[in-house]
């Protein structure tokens, strides 16, 4: 039996919420990634640090990485700008010096003030971004400057919890200018395609925790995806995800990379019988306890219910709400573990919590 990691020659792995939360690795991440023999590329929407700085942070946490293993939204944003502007054009930086350095590396001139007459504005996460930075950017955008956001993640997973992400700052400028930026990072496919282009890869797999960036980005790039439940989105979010945000596989954490892809796939599961009708998805246990435990990593019910809900949604032109119900006590306990028994809840965008 091959593991899902062995089936793919390249893993495009998200960082925040997938590999680590702030300064803490996620469960089993260090050991799991050390055992993966496929090429590992860390693909991050976080534009606050350079590729070398990201690699150094990974090494501090016990991982093995170099700058060549890291693909950042700052790099993607700089490439996007270089394709739109003449060499030497001025770009107002709302973000860190790492972002400014990426802009300079593609032959553009980083500036920080509206008085420098910028041709474009690029915005990435910085913990020190303040009102004055946003004010300079707002003036430039209103004056016609091209506006590029490294990403629009509304939150940033940390060991303290979810903190404001770059998307929260982007929202402030949207409100102030009435304009929308071009987005360089996930879910736009450019970041994924740039990563895959770093080698002759034939079977890449995207691994991440966010439906609205990692998984939607994988789907946009035509790549399979493994959703892990260590960051922003939950099992319930996956069950009710919009089609563009539906993962191919669901696992607990990065230890799932060493499981069989057939176990991880969102599909009907032998341990559960599911009936759909009357606005309800009814789940019953199927088989004896020993057999169920043998094939189940605890998430089989999530994969089974997600498969059933997605199929039901595809067949319902009116997109009516669905209830998830337990047909027996074993199903009830499994559904309650993942908070899936929320009745009469309309299906909406669930990219963030």
Swiss-Prot record:
Cystine crosslinks: none
Listed GO MF terms: cobalt ion binding; glycerol-1-phosphatase activity; magnesium ion binding; manganese ion binding; phosphatase activity; protein homodimerization activity
Cofactor(s) the record lists: Mg(2+); Co(2+); Mn(2+)
Q: Which residues bind Mg(2+)?
A: 14, 16, 209
Q: Which residues form the active site?
A: 14, 16
A cellular component term (GO) from this record? cytoplasm
Signal peptide boundaries:
none
Q: Which reaction does it catalyse?
A: sn-glycerol 1-phosphate + H2O = glycerol + phosphate
What does the record give as its pathway? Answer: Glycerolipid metabolism
Q: Knockout consequence?
A: Deletion of this gene results in an accumulation of G3P and G3P-containing lipid polar heads.
* Gene3D superfamilies in UniProt: 3.30.300.290, HAD superfamily/HAD-like
Q: Which UniProt keywords apply?
A: Glycerol metabolism, Hydrolase, Magnesium, Metal-binding
Q: Which domain of life is it from?
A: Bacteria
The note describing how and how many cofactors are bound reads: Although Co(2+) and Mn(2+) support eight- and fourfold higher catalytic efficiency than Mg(2+), respectively, Mg(2+) is likely the physiologically relevant catalytic divalent metal ion.
- Which Gene Ontology biological process is one annotated for this entry? glycerophospholipid catabolic process
- Family indicated by similarity: Belongs to the HAD-like hydrolase superfamily.
Q: How would you summarize the oligomeric state and partners of this protein?
A: Homodimer.
What the protein does comes down to: Dephosphorylates D-glycerol 3-phosphate (sn-glycerol 1-phosphate). Is the final enzyme involved in the recycling/catabolism of glycerophospholipid polar heads. To a lesser extent, is also able to act on glycerol 2-phosphate and D-ribulose 5-phosphate, but cannot use D-glyceraldehyde 3-phosphate, dihydroxyacetone-phosphate, UMP or GMP as substrates.
Task: Provide the domain comment.
Answer: Crystal structures of Rv1692 reveal a unique architecture, a fusion of a predicted haloacid dehalogenase fold with a previously unidentified GCN5-related N-acetyltransferase (GNAT) region. Although not directly involved in acetyl transfer, or regulation of enzymatic activity in vitro, the GNAT region is critical for the solubility of the phosphatase.
PANTHER family from the xrefs? 4-NITROPHENYLPHOSPHATASE-RELATED, D-GLYCEROL 3-PHOSPHATE PHOSPHATASE
Any idea what this protein is called? D-glycerol 3-phosphate phosphatase
